[in-house]
């Protein structure tokens, strides 16, 4: 599935997240276990804008990191983009997180994630999110896969 678009219906089959915590609307590009580019349409209807901040709503940095982590989770799937029964992807670490641009309601947040390595059950990714081609956030992320109990 090289450079393939994947819509929300397929994302819902792959990720266990649901509203209000599903933060990937579309996969724009995908090379299995190599790289992924995803999209989040940031709307004023997101529940976190009620308190962050009512007079000047901005997307919380931790939510941008979560959107990157969900994108990274999608990247761990093979070329068939099938979820293994009972598999859950856990965010286990973050290094070098930097926030460089404020993300506002109405923005389109593009997440770009590449696999750095996979060793002893731990995936390591290089990730960055952009708005209008300007980097809003960058980080190295780590995740692992476990069977649901």
Swiss-Prot record:
Its EC number(s): 4.2.1.59
GO cellular component, one term: cytoplasm
Catalytic reactions of this protein: a (3R)-hydroxyacyl-[ACP] = a (2E)-enoyl-[ACP] + H2O
Keyword Lyase recorded: yes
Chief localisation class: cytoplasm
GO biological process, one term: fatty acid biosynthetic process
Coiled-coil portions: none
The keyword Transport appears for this protein: no
Enzyme class: lyase
Matches recorded under SUPFAM superfamilies: Thioesterase/thiol ester dehydrase-isomerase (SSF54637)
Family: Belongs to the thioester dehydratase family. FabZ subfamily.
GO molecular function: (3R)-hydroxyacyl-[acyl-carrier-protein] dehydratase activity
PANTHER family: 3-HYDROXYACYL-[ACYL-CARRIER-PROTEIN] DEHYDRATASE
Subcellular location: Cytoplasm
Any Pfam family hit: FabA
Active site residues per record: 52
Origin superkingdom: Bacteria
Function according to Swiss-Prot or TrEMBL: Involved in unsaturated fatty acids biosynthesis. Catalyzes the dehydration of short chain beta-hydroxyacyl-ACPs and long chain saturated and unsaturated beta-hydroxyacyl-ACPs.
Classification via HAMAP family: FabZ
Keywords noted in UniProt: Cytoplasm, Lipid A biosynthesis, Lipid biosynthesis, Lipid metabolism, Lyase
The protein's name: 3-hydroxyacyl-[acyl-carrier-protein] dehydratase FabZ
């Amino acid at each position: 599935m090289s450079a393939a678009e994947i819509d929300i219906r397929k994302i819902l089959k792959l990720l266990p997240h649901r509203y209000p915590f599903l933060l990937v609307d579309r996969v724009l590009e995908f090379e299995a276990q190599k790289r992924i580019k995803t999209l989040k349409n940031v709307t004023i209807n997101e529940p976190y804008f009620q308190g962050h901040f009512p007079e000047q709503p901005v997307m919380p940095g931790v939510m941008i990191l979560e959107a990157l982590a969900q994108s990274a989770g999608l990247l761990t799937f093979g070329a068939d983009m099938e979820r293994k029964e009972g598999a859950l992807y856990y965010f286990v670490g973050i290094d070098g997180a930097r926030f460089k641009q404020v993300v506002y309601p109405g923005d389109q947040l593009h997440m770009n994630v590449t696999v750095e390595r996979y060793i002893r059950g731990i995936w390591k990714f290089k990730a960055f999110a952009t708005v209008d081609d300007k980097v809003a956030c960058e980080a190295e992320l780590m995740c692992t896969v476990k069977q649901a109990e």
